[in-house]
Curated annotation (Swiss-Prot):
GO terms for cellular component: ribonucleoprotein complex; ribosome. This is Large ribosomal subunit protein bL9. Belongs to the bacterial ribosomal protein bL9 family. HAMAP family: Ribosomal_bL9.
C-alpha cells in the first residue's frame, strides 16, 4: 500500500515522504495512529502543492533575513558612557542594543542571537556578531562615546 507519512516514523519514513508499506502494517498500526494517510492521486497532488508553497515561504523568509543582515551591517548604533580619568562607568548590554534597534530602526532581534557577547565598556568603535536565521551572520557596528 502506498502511503504519505504525516509524522516521522523511525525505520519507516519521514514526514511528507511517499512510500510503499505492507497493507497489514498500514491498516493495523500506521493508519489508526494517524501516522500516515493513503496516497491517492489527489493527496499526492495536494502534498506536492503544499511542499512547493513551503519552499516558497522559506525562500521568502531567507530573502528577508538577508535584507535584515544588509540593514544591520549598514547602520551604526551610538551610545554614550560616562568616564572619569580614563575609567569607564557602566556598560552597554545586549538588551540596550536590542532596545535601540527596536526603537530607532524597527528591527526585532532576540538578545540570545548575539555570538560570544560581553557587555561593552570600551570607548570607540565595537563590533558585535549576531546569528540570524538560516545560519546567516551579521556584524553590528556600535560607536561608544564619552559623555
Amino acid at each position: 500500500m502506498k502511503v504519505i507519512f504525516l509524522k516521522d516514523v523511525p525505520g519507516q519514513g519521514k514526514k511528507n515522504e511517499i512510500k510503499e508499506v505492507s497493507d497489514g502494517y498500514a491498516r493495523n498500526y500506521l493508519l489508526p495512529n494517524q501516522l500516515v494517510k493513503i496516497a491517492t492521486n489527489n493527496s499526492v497532488k495536494t502534498l506536492k502543492e503544499h511542499l512547493k508553497a513551503d519552499q516558497e515561504e522559506k525562500e521568502l523568509a531567507k530573502a528577508q533575513t538577508k535584507q535584515i543582515k544588509k540593514t544591520l551591517e549598514e547602520l551604526t548604533l551610538h551610545f554614550k558612557l560616562q568616564t572619569n580619568d580614563d575609567k569607564v562607568f557602566g556598560s552597554i548590554s545586549s538588551q540596550d542594543i536590542v532596545n535601540q534597534l527596536k526603537d530607532l530602526h524597527r528591527i526585532e532581534l532576540d538578545k540570545k542571537k548575539f555570538i560570544r557577547f560581553k557587555n561593552i565598556n570600551k570607548i570607540g568603535i565595537n563590533y558585535i556578531k549576531v546569528k540570524l536565521d538560516f545560519g546567516i551572520e551579521a556584524i553590528i557596528k556600535v560607536d561608544v562615546k564619552e559623555v
